[in-house]
Amino acid sequence: AVAATSGLEAGTIPSSAELRLAPDACPGRQRGGRGEGLVCLTGFLDRRGEPYRTAMSSPLHAFDACSRLSPHLAWGTLAMREVAQATWRRQRELKALSPSEVGRWRGALTSFSGRLHWRCHFMQKLEDEPRLEFENLHRAYDALRTGEPDRARLEAWQRGETGWPFVDACMRALAATGWMNFRMRAMLMAVASYHLWLDWRRPGEHLARLFTDYEPGIHWPQVQMQSGTTGINTIRIYNPIKQGYDQDPEGVFVRKWLPELDAVPDRFIHEPWKWENAATVLDKAYPSPILDHAQVAKAARQKIWSIRAAPEFRDEANRIQGRHGSRKSGMANTGRRRKPAPRDTRQLTLGLEPPGE
């Protein structure tokens, strides 16, 4: 222990207002520190994690059902090894339980363990090719989105005012909490890249500033994946309206983060412009859609695939696949059929198999 200096009064820690600091822009962030990290880990493995596999896709449930360990891993208050080993211990404990006691735990922890492996995989991508934080992984996309991004579109997306309720709710929740589940992170980035046709760098920087779990090795490969510029990953152009109906069917999440839509009936909450009284809300309390989402998605798809169809595209994609592709997936070069992954993939998964399995 450190002895107090005699003759000095400790006093009180000044508040942010007394220090003339700006108001906290992220009031709902997780508490940090080693103790909080251990509580979070134990709570997930012992109580919260059972519905993980099925609940992680929806922001309605993901804030509780996901591990919420990512900030602790990013800041070092928990180590990857201890999280992996604690997961394996819990998996061994399940073997002694009856099927009714196991419930959904086995599938949940298998899925979670897989994501720990993927975390290391993506970090290795950036370590291997650091330029992908700044440059398109596949050079054929260098001329895809040129010039400065449309400022009005970028700022509407940043503020959560695109006029697409589910997208805006996710952005506002992220800004207030510093966290969002993976699927919705992907949707936010895909909407910026495809629907708003923004170069991935500026939206990627904005999200990086918001995430309390920002990890460059995970963030930038994912940003490029969701923007379609890797050349080897599936093009996923999320329908922002369908995602709302799928992940928040009753509009509970949207209403929490977009209180200006309180008067909109449930059946119109994801498409308020279809409500007969839309004029009382749109462009007053809440903006009209910034663009026709179906039209801009179609245009984006055509632009992306026109580049992929070029004869010279495949050679570069094969180089990228050979360097960065997951060997465990068994994915062949882009022009060939896939084959099953070999059984012995221990080295390729960083040797992190649970002991005894």
Show where each model-derived region lies:
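Active-site-proximal binding-pocket segments
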Residues: 68-266
